[in-house]
């Protein structure tokens, strides 16, 4: 927030650079394009291992949205692929301690962008909650908001306990320690 305030107050010598697909145009698109290397790599590896360059499903977590945008970038228009966006459900979507912005957010303005925002009845941005510091953003990028609005993506909320359980299972079964 402070960085964005400084940028707004000093436009002549301050440049807005963020690693998430949020904020005003053209930043969400720039970040998505830069992160698109993820979907390029997915296509390449699938072609090598499976003989086709598209998956059946893409499942990605959504907070600031950069990893999800990179994962789906080269597949967005391919209707064969089902896209699932997993939001940080925190203690539960109905508890008030959540970061499930797509499911609970209402149209508002955050960081120079009109999108879904977790906010009070009078439009004040509320503090989201998640065990994952990288997923507790009170807004959502325009790419993901649009995918949800068009029903191109299925949106689910994963609560903290489910996320921890999945992390342990991934480590135990695959030997991958999630970030």
Region annotations inferred by a language model:
Residues 61-72, 93-94:
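Short glycine/serine/threonine-rich phosphate/pyrophosphate-binding segments
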Residues 35, 58-64, 87, 157-159, ...:
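Active-site nucleophile and cofactor-binding loops and adjacent substrate-binding regions
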